[in-house]
Amino acid sequence: DNMRYDTLETCHRNAFRFFGGVPREVLYDNMKTVVLQRDAYQTGQHRFHPSLWQFGKEMGFSPRLCRPFRAQTKGKVERMVQYTRNSFYIPLMTRLRPMGITVDVETANRHGLRWLHDVANQRKHETIQARPCDRWLEEQQSMLALPPE
């Protein structure tokens, strides 16, 4: 809905609670709520948004940036958005529109959790050659504990 820092942090907190932990690294696109200047101090040492940097320290994760114009990193995110739109959002709108139901955030979240469980996490993912639900069982072990609120 917006590109404000407080929205970004709220989304992170919700995601960390959903996953029951904090990843050691979080990969970002080069948006201003994350990075103020790439390679500010030297190659690979960026000047991050101070609020994000502090939040990362509090939660225990390190921010990492996609390299600009590099499909191997940014393209993965863009493909995920396209997959979600084509496999979840458009079919959901197509099903609900004839019933006069608008796809708002609450409706999308409710249906989205079911779609993640029944569809997205059950298929074999091309990049990792595994089902996301199976990979999650392995990766869950490396998550950091949520700090107390």
Predicted regions and their residues:
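Active-site beta-loop-alpha junctions of metal-dependent nucleic acid enzymes
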Residues: D1-E25, Q45-H46
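Short, conserved loop/turn and helix-capping segments at secondary-structure boundaries
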Residues: N2, Q42-P50, E78
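Alpha-helical scaffold elements adjacent to nucleotide-binding pockets in ATP/GTP-utilizing enzyme cores
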Residues: C11, S51, F55, K76-T84, ...
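RNase H-like two-metal-ion nuclease catalytic core shared by retroviral integrases
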Residues: Y28-D29, Q42-T43, M59-N86, V103-A108
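Acidic, His- and aromatic-enriched active-site or binding-groove loops in soluble protein domains
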Residues: Q45-F61, R85-R95
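Active-site-proximal acidic segments at structured loop/helix or strand boundaries
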Residues: V81-E149
